[in-house]
């Protein structure tokens, strides 16, 4: 095997890896069902659902970011794909403490999950 062949193979592997990384970063359409809960309680209290809607609203109004907590315990961070990015609490606060179905573009990176919201509806 000559050095030119090795370099071509390495270049091809790098191009494929970059393409896969880009595809993963692009996000996929998805649906998430879970409770709208403030991020502090989701992490520090180990809750499986919000204490109350009033508590979640109060925390959101105090600046805590609202997240979606699934029944499996997965936390989805609502994010914006706008530049500059904008917070998503205003889209979720009316559902704080309640079960919702969120549709949008789902992203995953190093164990973290996020969703760019296209629609939010109360779960039935």
Give, region by region, the residue ranges found by the protein language model.
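Residue-level detector of alpha-helix boundary/anchor positions
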Residues: 12-15, 29
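OB-fold and OB-like single-stranded nucleic-acid-recognition modules
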Residues: 21-124
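Bacterial N-terminal signal peptides that target proteins for export
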Residues: 1-11, 18
